[in-house]
Design a protein with these regions (language model features):
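Histidine-dependent nucleotide/RNA phosphoesterase domain, centered on the 2H-phosphoesterase fold
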Residues: 6-191
Length: 191
């Protein structure tokens, strides 16, 4: 029954992420307000919904229901630490200065790297290619509507100090509909 709702004849686009707790999410919302009121007051941006902030650990892609179940079993076997500290350190474009994506960069701690590696092992084991890219943790704040956006300097946001603990790894389905990305929470794994 659940698969009929989630998959509707198509493979789901799946990603795993750390979802900010209320404290961290409130700090991210305040950061977005500051950006909107200062350097980006005239910018044409699709801002991330305040309820959709997340720090992606692994974007798996299209999965069959059986693969999803196998992934759940693999994640349940991971020994996570009791909590994870997330430290947001700067506002930037992602993956490079020419991009449309506006993000809050997270410090790439050993704990984050270990979670990334453990999850990557699980998805590789069930037939998905290992992520060859360097893991660059971030939380999306918004996306510029125009590819030829003006240049912006985030000097005053180059050393932000936003931090909190998280203790849940979430599995989401991502769906693109009428120019907007919608996320559906499928399952949560508490540390």
């Amino acid at each position: 029954m659940v698969y009929l709702l989630l998959f509707n004849g198509n493979m789901a686009r799946i990603f795993l992420a750390l979802t900010p707790n209320k404290d961290l999410n409130d700090q991210i919302i305040e950061l977005k307000k500051e950006l909107k009121n200062t350097v980006l007051s005239e910018a044409d941006i699709n801002w991330q919904k305040n309820s959709d902030h997340h720090l992606t650990i692994n974007f798996v892609g299209a999965m069959e229901p059986e693969q999803l179940e196998e992934m759940y079993l693999g994640i349940e076997q991971i020994n996570f630490m009791s909590h994870l500290q997330i430290d947001l350190s700067a506002v930037s474009f992602f993956p490079n200065e020419e991009s449309q994506l506006l993000v809050a960069l997270a410090k790439p701690t050993n704990q984050l790297q270990k979670i990334f590696e453990r999850v990557d092992e699980v998805v590789t084991r069930i037939g998905f290619g290992s992520s060859l890219k360097t893991y660059r943790p971030h939380i999306t704040l918004g996306r510029f509507k125009d590819k030829s956006r003006p240049q912006y300097s985030f000097e005053e946001f180059s050393e932000i100090n936003i931090s909190s603990r998280v203790n849940i790894l979430d599995v989401y389905e991502s769906e693109f509909d009428q120019g907007k990305t919608n996320y559906s929470l499928l399952k949560s794994f508490e540390f």
